[in-house]
């Protein structure tokens, strides 16, 4: 007979099911679409996406789509989370800044690779929920801050990598200056709020940067002093929306 307290708590059927779904997600949605970094794939296998969703939505946790989390914000599609983190080219142990904590899911994935993660969220209620979800999972190397993410978080600078989970009209100067030499900034950028290009900026010296365009994406807008002033209204139902080609 096993000694009292020597066994782990039983694994629930739900936990087993979610773990299997998570493995399929990595194989079918992420690896199959070109994400190859073993650190990123391992991190995506490790973090339970369902823990960052309301109870009523947890059955959708491993769908290949973004999901609403309230306040006009979303938890990003799993593939996009993986692709953006891969674009940061992390080796492990870095200091990372995330703009747009949202649910906290991407910060949890980053925390499996980076040494220290600071994530900024403009909306206080979401910042509180993200912090609670991270704490419930015992993730201790993430600091959640509320503030204007377009201005970064100077107290923690310089950062080895910065990832922005919202689309802005340009790359904020504050984020560029908070990058370490050799650091990478990955962010969606577009001239309007309906669609963006995913851009990677590498700071090659104090005064020089290199920019690459990676993919077409669509994110919620980055609201702030160095982003958009406000969310643009949706197109009226009685007028056709503009189609971008």
UniProtKB/Swiss-Prot annotation:
The name this protein goes by in its record: Protein-L-isoaspartate O-methyltransferase 1
Q: From the Swiss-Prot or TrEMBL record, what is one GO molecular function term?
A: protein-L-isoaspartate (D-aspartate) O-methyltransferase activity
Per its UniProt entry, what is the enzyme's top EC class, as one word?
A: transferase
Cite the InterPro entries for this sequence: PCMT, SAM-dependent_MTases_sf
| One Gene Ontology biological process | methylation
Tell whether S-adenosyl-L-methionine is among the UniProt keywords: yes
> Which family is annotated?
Belongs to the methyltransferase superfamily. L-isoaspartyl/D-aspartyl protein methyltransferase family.
Q: What does this protein do?
A: Catalyzes the methyl esterification of L-isoaspartyl residues in peptides and proteins that result from spontaneous decomposition of normal L-aspartyl and L-asparaginyl residues. It plays a role in the repair and/or degradation of damaged proteins.
- Which reaction(s) does its UniProt entry say it catalyses? [protein]-L-isoaspartate + S-adenosyl-L-methionine = [protein]-L-isoaspartate alpha-methyl ester + S-adenosyl-L-homocysteine
Tell me which EC number(s) this protein carries. Answer: 2.1.1.77
Q: Which domain of life is it from?
A: Bacteria
Instruction: Give yes or no: UniProt keyword Endoplasmic reticulum.
Output: no
Q: What's the short name of a Pfam family annotated to this entry? A: PCMT
- Predominant subcellular localization, coarse grouping: cytoplasm
Gene of this entry: pcm1
One GO cellular component this record assigns the protein to is: cytoplasm
Q: Which positions make up the signal peptide?
A: none
Q: Where is the active site?
A: 76
The record's SUPFAM superfamilies line, in alphabetical order, gives:
S-adenosyl-L-methionine-dependent methyltransferases
Task: Provide the transmembrane region boundaries.
Answer: none
Q: Where in the cell is it found?
A: Cytoplasm
């Amino acid at each position: 007979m096993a000694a009292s307290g020597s066994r782990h708590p039983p694994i629930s059927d739900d936990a087993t099911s979610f773990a299997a779904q998570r493995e399929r997600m990595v194989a079918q949605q992420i690896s199959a679409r070109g994400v190859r970094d073993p650190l990123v794939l391992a991190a995506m296998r490790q973090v339970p996406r369902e823990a960052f969703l309301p109870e009523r939505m947890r059955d959708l946790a491993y769908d290949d789509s973004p999901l609403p989390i309230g306040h006009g914000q979303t938890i990003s599609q799993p593939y996009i989370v993986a692709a953006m983190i891969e674009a940061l080219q992390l080796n492990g142990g870095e200091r990372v800044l995330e703009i747009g904590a949202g649910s906290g899911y991407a910060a949890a994935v980053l925390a499996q690779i980076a040494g220290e993660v600071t994530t900024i969220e403009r909306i206080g209620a979401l910042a509180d929920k993200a912090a609670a979800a991270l704490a419930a999972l015992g993730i201790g190397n993430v600091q959640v801050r509320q503030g204007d993410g377009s201005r970064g978080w100077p107290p923690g600078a310089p950062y080895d990598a910065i990832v922005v989970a919202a689309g802005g009209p340009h790359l904020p100067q504050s984020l560029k200056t908070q990058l370490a030499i050799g650091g990478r900034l990955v962010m969606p950028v577009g001239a309007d709020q309906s669609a963006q290009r995913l851009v990677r900026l590498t700071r090659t010296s104090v005064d020089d940067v290199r920019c690459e365009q990676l993919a077409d994406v669509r994110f919620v807008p980055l609201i702030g002093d160095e982003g958009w002033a406000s969310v643009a209204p949706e197109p009226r139902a009685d007028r056709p929306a503009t189609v971008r080609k």
